[in-house]
């Protein structure tokens, strides 16, 4: 009962015939190409290993679960190629495993890879929903480069192509960090969202989240949750490309993760994939951001273990 994450982890390779039954599986995406294309502050390539370092000494509370690590996919020059390779690793982990798969970023371009991983792992008819904790919609149109600002526009285009509904919710969006054009596109694409200001009202925020998400959760088979670390106040998450002046509370996100794990049976969806994006150790102070990322991952694992 005295084990910590670093004592529990098995390093595995994609493609081996591993039994990952009841495992939590980590997959890193070393990329800041999308951040660079988005004209942001680079450094998120070192994010996955910084998060691992912060996870290493956390206690392991789930005696029946194993921990696997599939290592990192690195984006050197070709972002789309690296996203496909990372998507293959996510797809492999989801197919080999019935536990939670966790993507470690890397810039938020990780999200396009994560989505493709779920899409490829599931039957064509599976309805996928995305919940993004983020100060930004990330619904920009690729022009022509894709970036850390385009992943959910890419998902929207993919849904149009496959004639499937676009189920996307963004929690913590900042009016001061998204243009009117992005708000217009969010509205025409039926993006569900709550602003950072709306989520800073502690007495009402969980009720608002329930009202926003429940209709979507009823309509999906698979849930993918992505946390962009710039959703949090700069004092708590300085190690990101675009620090937030306001941000939302980590406790709110943790409560929502537990809400999402709990409602799987109520609404009949599965939550199997979570990623954490925009970890940039170059700008971190006292590993604050890495420790926050690790705590959120710990809580996602705890939420799913408690409600499965």
Task: Give a label for each model feature.
Residues 1-28, 33-308:
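Conserved alpha-helical scaffold segments that buttress catalytic/binding sites
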């Amino acid at each position: 009962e005295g084990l910590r994450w670093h004592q529990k982890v098995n390093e595995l390779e994609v493609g081996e015939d591993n039994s990952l039954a009841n495992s939590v599986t980590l997959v890193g995406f070393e990329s800041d190409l999308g951040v660079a294309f988005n004209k942001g502050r680079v450094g998120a390539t070192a994010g996955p290993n910084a998060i691992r370092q912060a996870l290493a000494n956390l206690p392991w509370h789930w005696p029946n679960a194993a921990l696997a690590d599939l290592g990192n996919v690195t984006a050197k020059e070709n972002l789309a190629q690296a996203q496909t390779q990372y998507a293959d690793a996510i797809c492999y982990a989801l197919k080999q495993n019935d536990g939670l798969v966790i993507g470690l970023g890397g810039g938020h371009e990780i999200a396009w890879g994560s989505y493709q991983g779920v899409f490829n792992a599931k039957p064509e008819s599976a309805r996928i929903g995305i919940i993004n904790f983020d100060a930004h919609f990330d619904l920009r149109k690729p022009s022509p480069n894709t970036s850390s600002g385009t992943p959910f526009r890419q998902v929207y285009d993919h849904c149009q192509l496959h004639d499937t509904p676009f189920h996307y919710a963004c929690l913590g969006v900042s009016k001061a960090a998204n243009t009117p054009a992005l708000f217009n596109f969010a509205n025409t694409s039926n993006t569900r969202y709550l602003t950072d200001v709306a989520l800073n009202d502690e007495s009402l925020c969980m009720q608002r989240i329930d009202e926003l998400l429940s209709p979507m959760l009823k309509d999906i088979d698979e849930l993918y949750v992505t946390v962009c670390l710039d959703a949090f106040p700069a004092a708590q998450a300085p190690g990101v490309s675009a620090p937030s002046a306001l941000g939302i509370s980590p406790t709110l996100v943790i409560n929502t993760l537990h809400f999402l794990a709990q409602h799987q049976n109520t609404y009949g969806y599965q939550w199997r994939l979570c990623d954490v994006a925009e970890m940039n150790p170059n700008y971190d102070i006292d590993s604050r951001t890495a420790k926050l990322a690790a705590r959120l991952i710990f809580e996602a694992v705890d939420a799913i273990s408690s409600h499965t």
